Amino acid sequence: MAEVPELASEMMAYYSGNEDDLFFDVDGPKQMKCSFQDLDLCPLGGGIQLQISHEHYNEGFRQAVSVVVAMEKLRKMLVPCPQIFQDNDLSTLIPFIFEEEPVFLDTRNNDACVHDAPVRSLHCTLRDAQLKSLVMSGPYELKALHLQGQDLEQQVVFSMSFVQGEESNDKIPVALGLKAKNLYLSCVLKDDKPTLQLESVDPKNYPKKKMEKRFVFNKIEINNKLEFESAQFPNWYISTSQAENMPVFLGGTRGGQDITDFTMQFVSS
């Protein structure tokens, strides 16, 4: 912040010298014969009067603002002359001194802002349109099969996180992690074909608001059914086979032999 200089000697020459009422006359060294206590407005035709209170003499910023405003900003208008310069008076003068300008923050490359944002998550299970549940088959594979009774405890509980992505009215970007495991569903290219896999991650860094694109799925709701489209590979969906006990995979067709419709059941934390 720039320093406000002390009152110049030329200005001090216009100082009245009265201990009780100190005035400045903008037009010259003529002491004004009026009191701030008797006037609500100081007309500029009679000169601009400034009262400096000894009680607030050490508050240099207030004093400087009074002088600057009177000499530079209030020359063309009528201004109230309060008995004592108060905090609320300063707040009303600030807009006349400083010009307000909008500040635009470019966050396109500011990943730190996104990383620090809280991630909203929920726990759920998924079943396909044939009511097959998803279960673990080996350390890095999911299969779909029918479960009943106590076997339902085998189904995978997902931690669905709402992440950054191309959100629209019908698409919500999410990441699908496995509850209590450091595994996330991700989409990668293998043998020139989009492929679904379970990928191990560092729990210190995941989940996060800005997930890598291979982890992001667009959750689409149609007729109370859900589809999960890969953000990395548009028009490719989490799919199951018509057959029992087959791996969950990434399919490129909808409404055909492969099942892309799921129902979601919420699970309490």
Swiss-Prot record:
InterPro entries: IL-1_CS, IL-1_fam, IL-1_propep, IL1/FGF. The keyword Cytoplasm applies. The keyword Cytoplasm applies. Gene3D superfamilies: 2.80.10.50. GO terms for biological process: cellular response to lipopolysaccharide; cytokine-mediated signaling pathway; fever generation; immune response; inflammatory response; positive regulation of canonical NF-kappaB signal transduction; positive regulation of cell division; positive regulation of immature T cell proliferation in thymus. CDD domains: beta-trefoil_IL1B. Monomer. In its precursor form, weakly interacts with full-length MEFV; the mature cytokine does not interact at all. Interacts with integrins ITGAV:ITGBV and ITGA5:ITGB1; integrin-binding is required for IL1B signaling. Interacts with cargo receptor TMED10; the interaction is direct and is required for the secretion of IL1B mature form. Interacts with HSP90AB1; the interaction facilitates cargo translocation into the ERGIC. Interacts with HSP90B1; the interaction facilitates cargo translocation into the ERGIC. This is Interleukin-1 beta. The gene is IL1B.
